[in-house]
Amino acid sequence: MSTNEAAASQEDIALAQGAVLVKSCQVPDGSIPIRGFDFSTASGPDFSLSAILSSYMSTGFQATHLAQAIQQVNQMLSLRDTPLTCDDDEKLFPYPEGRQKRSCTIFLGYTSNLVTSGLREVLRYCVQRNLVDCIVTSAGGIEEDLIKCLKPSYLGTFTMDGAKLRSNGMNRAGNVLIPNDNYCAFEDWLMPILDECLVEQEEKHLNWTPSKLIQRLGERIGDESSILYWAAKHRIPVFCPALTDGSLGDMLYFHSVKSSPGLRVDIVEDVRHINTIAVKSFKTGSIILGGGVVKHHINNANLMRNGADHTVYINTGQEFDGSDSGAQPDEAVSWGKVKPSAGAVKVHAEATLVFPLLVAETFAKHEGHKD
């Protein structure tokens, strides 16, 4: 190699090193080193789920987001348990109506497919233990909870032939199968209740809303496996702005054909109710599983108070199509639906995978400490 070639080579190396080995700045104080759960140091074969989940904060990626979500929910619960500091007049004006006023109102939202799945039992636990204050779901989140009290759904696969299932009277939701007979049983149970509601509308001038109708259905189902049973028992309002978008809507349609005048369901009274809940709350926390109308209805109610104080999203939606379903929490901050100080977090995951883990480290542990 010539002297010129050697000099050029050294210059190239120096240039490459300067590009590759850029000097690092000082790591900020409090930075968390990345480290996952070490099974080799676990104490015996009976290490706890809690020990694994406690390592998630330093694991990175969505494990860290789940750990942050757990922190957020525990902050909601801690704040909710804080004694109220307000005058007696304010305490006499509680929201939601018929419930004890809390220092933090927890909104829980979930899409219908999650009630179709076994996540129904996890959701029911939170409602049964009276740990949330306001629920928003879609029509399937109402009907699937009630139908499962009448007849079960079954495990299938994602790849089952649709035409064959149709000819056999089986409906597929992901890898869950719902026989058509389930909806027949639902119709037989529901129609007499709708008849009663119509009589009350005409004779007592009762103005039905989705939440009032859902409260009635929860009272009538009489089954402790039901989310709505416990919501009715604890007077937790369940809002469903898209009540007609599902089998429940089919039944309302069938009922309207045979009834004149028909049953009327007022969504305006309900939007006033949920917005007033948000406005009259001292602090609010939102836990939203999935997207669509469920996510936006909770966020928009919190806009009326200039944003939720704590927010957790769990969904698989992406923001690149401009949808509200996939939007990050910071987009909601721009609209005033989440406070900038909320420490909001989105867990990019399918809710049946991670919500039971979150409940284990938050709601269940909270109740365990009380017991």
UniProtKB/Swiss-Prot annotation:
GO terms for cellular component: cytoplasm. Its cofactor is NAD(+). Spermidine binds at E143, E144, D250, H296, G322, S323, D324, E331, A332, V333, S334, W335, G336, K337. Its EC number is 2.5.1.46. Pathway: Protein modification; eIF5A hypusination. The active site is at K337 (nucleophile). SUPFAM superfamilies: DHS-like NAD/FAD-binding domain. NAD(+) binds at residues 112-116, 138-140, 144, 245, 291, 316-317, 350-351. One of its GO terms (molecular function) is deoxyhypusine synthase activity. One of its GO terms (biological process) is spermidine metabolic process. The keyword NAD applies. It comes from the Eukaryota. Keywords: Hypusine biosynthesis, NAD, Transferase. Catalyzes the NAD-dependent oxidative cleavage of spermidine and the subsequent transfer of the butylamine moiety of spermidine to the epsilon-amino group of a critical lysine residue of the eIF-5A precursor protein to form the intermediate deoxyhypusine residue. This is the first step of the post-translational modification of that lysine into an unusual amino acid residue named hypusine. Hypusination is unique to mature eIF-5A factor and is essential for its function. This is Deoxyhypusine synthase. It comes from Caenorhabditis elegans. The lineage of its organism: Eukaryota, Metazoa, Ecdysozoa, Nematoda, Chromadorea. The gene is dhps-1.
